[in-house]
């Protein structure tokens, strides 16, 4: 396709820019460049309108563009730098550094639009990824090379949970991570960067960094937010395919990817579908998700925070991502209101890996028994609210007492929340998690007060806390 093909801007409508070409038209998804008062502005071709005009989506602000301005076709899609040099750096959607630490110099650049691996290239074994977070490892374990959705409304702790996962996995697993910040708060992106420097995950002096960051935050135009997840994924694919790594790919927040698509969809003149979303919702989501997979060379394990508009899981945006997930971790506001963090709902979180053939018989039985006790407590809550605890049978009272202890034992102090809570974070081994909950459901700890189980790591700490409480009471 013709490189350096020149065109002129004919119309600017928000983030959508129409460009007229006299010669050959650039193909769909090609990158065009223009100069906007000294800044390089990249436009991506979205539609061909008639013989000589293309409709494009801008990757940055379009203020200052004028009709008649010259635009150059680059002859290919948007590319981003890939390789070990991107670790420890923050880039934007077009691969420019935004951390004020000089240019990112790499031997290669990859296009952000790439084909998903073929059937023959994919690997299918199931292996558990231990996170050190009790509720996740017990109830909805994550698999290597799997896709995990973190569902929750505003302010229930999705971002904190993602930060803890990055922290635990970088320490316990030592692999590389790529973090794509899609349409979230810039403050959180800045906090994450500084926390990673403090934790040693980003090494400013040497080359020990474990994570690459790609940001397209809330203040960015929708074009950048709709493409930044693809830019991050491209960097993760390099580590998987060229270096044979098991990579972790974090997206915060995948809903904003859909939201950005819906913002430009109307400007592109498409007829909206249900709830005003773009008609290509499932296609856009599939194109991103199908590239996140394990191949025979390495794997990409993806953790995606999914904002649920108005806490409605049937909304088309969260519903479109459900189909692609291997495990779901649902955060519940009513659990957060009890002060139990992480506010993961053990009855609403699922995993394909919670299968005796994958996790083993003991783990499976303990997890199901924990869910059974919590479900019984949930169904008794109406009776308790109306008639009180005294009207329950002896057996039901025991179930309620155990369920309340289990609920509290599912909470855990996080390393990344130390600055707010003052209590040091805990990383709990899978063995300790299973042992602790097995003892709880079998009634070994019926004599301990429920408050002893709140915000501790393993069972030994709960017993220690109970002794301390007894000593203080005496």
Swiss-Prot record:
Catalytic activity: ATP + H2O + 4 H(+)(in) = ADP + phosphate + 5 H(+)(out)
GO molecular-function terms, A-Z: ATP binding; ATP hydrolysis activity; proton-transporting ATP synthase activity, rotational mechanism
Gene Ontology CC: one annotated term: plasma membrane
EC nos: 7.1.2.2
Any Pfam family hit: ATP-synt_VA_C
InterPro entries according to UniProt: AAA+_ATPase, ATP-synt_VA_C, ATP_synth_F1_bsu, ATPase_a/bsu_AS, ATPase_alpha/beta_chains, ATPase_F1/V1/A1_a/bsu_N, ATPase_F1/V1/A1_a/bsu_N_sf, ATPase_F1/V1/A1_a/bsu_nucl-bd
Membrane topology according to the record: Peripheral membrane protein
Residues forming coiled coils: none
The keyword Ion transport belongs to this UniProt entry's keyword annotation: yes
SMART domains: AAA
Subcellular location: Cell inner membrane
This protein's UniProt keywords: ATP synthesis, ATP-binding, Cell inner membrane, Cell membrane, CF(1), Hydrogen ion transport, Ion transport, Membrane, Nucleotide-binding, Translocase, Transport
Binding site for ATP: 152-159
Function as written in the Swiss-Prot or TrEMBL entry: Produces ATP from ADP in the presence of a proton gradient across the membrane. The catalytic sites are hosted primarily by the beta subunits.
NCBIfam families assigned: atpD
Family per record: Belongs to the ATPase alpha/beta chains family.
Stated name of the protein: ATP synthase subunit beta
UniProt source species: Rhodospirillum rubrum
Taxonomic lineage: Bacteria, Pseudomonadati, Pseudomonadota, Alphaproteobacteria, Rhodospirillales
């Amino acid at each position: 396709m013709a490189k350096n093909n020149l065109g002129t801007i004919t119309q600017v409508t928000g983030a959508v820019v129409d460009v007229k070409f006299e010669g050959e038209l650039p193909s769909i998804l090609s990158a065009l460049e223009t100069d906007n008062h000294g800044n390089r502005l990249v436009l991506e071709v979205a539609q061909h309108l008639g013989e000589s005009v293309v409709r494009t989506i801008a990757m940055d602000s379009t203020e200052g563009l004028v009709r008649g301005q010259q635009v150059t076709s680059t002859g290919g899609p948007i590319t981003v730098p890939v390789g070990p040099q991107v670790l420890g750096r923050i880039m934007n959607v077009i691969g420019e550094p935004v951390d004020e630490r000089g240019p990112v110099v790499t031997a290669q650049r990859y296009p952000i639009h790439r084909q998903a691996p073929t059937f023959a290239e994919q690997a299918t074994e199931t292996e558990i990824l231990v996170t050190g977070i009790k509720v996740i490892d017990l109830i909805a374990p994550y698999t290597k090379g799997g896709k995990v959705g973190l569902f929750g409304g505003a302010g229930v702790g999705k971002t904190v949970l993602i930060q803890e996962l990055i922290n635990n996995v970088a320490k316990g697993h030592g692999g590389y991570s790529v973090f794509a910040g899609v349409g979230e708060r810039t403050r959180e992106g800045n906090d994450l960067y500084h926390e990673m420097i403090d934790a040693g995950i980003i090494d400013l002096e040497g080359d020990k960094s474990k994570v690459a960051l790609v940001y397209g935050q809330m203040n960015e135009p929708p074009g950048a937010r709709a493409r930044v997840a693809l830019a991050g994924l491209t960097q993760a694919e390099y580590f998987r395919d060229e270096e044979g790594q098991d990579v972790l790919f974090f997206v915060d927040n995948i809903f904003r990817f859909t939201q950005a698509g819906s913002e430009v969809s109307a400007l592109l003149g498409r007829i909206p579908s249900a709830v005003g979303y773009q008609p290509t919702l499932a296609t856009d989501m599939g194109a991103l998700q199908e590239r996140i997979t394990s191949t025979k060379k390495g794997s990409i394990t993806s953790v995606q925070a999914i904002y649920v508009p108005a806490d409605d899981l049937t909304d088309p945006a969260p519903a479109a991502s459900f189909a692609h997930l291997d495990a779901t971790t649902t955060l519940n506001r009513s659990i957060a209101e009890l002060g139990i963090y992480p506010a993961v709902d053990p009855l609403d979180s699922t995993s394909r890996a919670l299968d005796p053939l994958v996790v083993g018989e003991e783990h499976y039985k303990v997890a199901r028994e924990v869910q059974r006790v919590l479900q019984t407590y949930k169904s008794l809550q109406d009776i308790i609210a109306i008639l009180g605890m005294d009207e329950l049978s002896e057996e039901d009272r025991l179930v309620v007492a155990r369920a309340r202890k289990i609920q509290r034992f599912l909470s855990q102090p996080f390393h990344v929340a130390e600055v707010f809570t003052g209590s040091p974070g805990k990383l709990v081994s899978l063995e300790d998690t299973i042992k602790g909950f097995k003892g709880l459901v079998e009634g070994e700890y019926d004599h301990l007060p429920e408050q002893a189980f709140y915000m501790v790591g393993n069972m030994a700490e709960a017993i220690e806390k109970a002794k301390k409480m007894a000593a203080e009471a005496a």
